[in-house]
Amino acid sequence: MSNPSRTTLPFHKLGHGQRILLAFHGIGQDGVTCFQPFEAQLGKHYTIYAFDLFFHGKGVSMKSELITKQFWQSILHDFLAINNIERFDIAGFSMGGRFALATLEAFADRIDNVYLMAPDGISEHPIYALASRFSPARSIFRWSMQHPNAFLGISGFLQKAGLIHASLYRFVQQVLDTPEKRQTIYNSWVNFRALRFDISALYQKASTNNVSIYLFVGQYDKLLKPAAVRKLAALLPLDQYIVLKTGHTQLVDQAAAWICALFK
């Protein structure tokens, strides 16, 4: 494990508002492209620190190693101190949801609002668990990323058989179409596996610290179904679980518009 004090994440500073928002993007993205809608709609309310997470964007060359909660807490602790940030809000989309949850767990006493958009980390898909948690399976997963034709062929067969949705198949094709993207997927799946959460305990911690959690899902999202976030949704007030009429790719934009209404 690297020395956290020597590890910094690149970030993009967006907006000019008085409130602070730490924002964590989805897989295969970077901070600025993911959170441009937040800058456009919320930039007058927030100064947004949109991070390039490990193995993504300007952080693509970071060493492949397991990211633990303690490691993440140390990195953010240093970031907050250097930038003189005391209180803040957080946002996480898709993969970035894991980092939003890890941030909430570590800094609940300094957070006011959490915006989770189709977040990873609420539950764990069996395929992810199989591919990332066991050494033999990780070896097979690594091989499949180095030799993608078989993997894509099986995915195509499942799509034609109606076992996976066409939009999910297109997403798989898009995120695996270059060796660099496949390496990013492998590094992220394997190295983020320690970011797991007891959702009931985390919600209790948020409630104790008066943190408001807003959970957004897309009605037409085929990548993250509502069942994947049911554990958290069941705990939230009805007006903080928001189902938007959109799919996965437009969810950040739609959520930004919804959040903007909170300031009116």
Where in this protein do the model-derived segments appear?
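Conserved HGGG/HGGXW glycine-rich cap/lid loop of the alpha/beta-hydrolase fold
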Residues: 14-60
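Active-site loop/oxyanion-hole signature of alpha/beta-hydrolase fold enzymes
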Residues: 49-91
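Gly/Ala-rich beta-loop-alpha elbow adjacent to hydrolase catalytic centers
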Residues: 92-96, 100
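Flexible "cap/lid" loop of the alpha/beta hydrolase fold
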Residues: 105, 114-145
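Conserved alpha/beta-hydrolase catalytic His-Asp/Glu region
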Residues: 146-207
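Conserved alpha/beta-hydrolase "acid-adjacent" motif
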Residues: 222-228
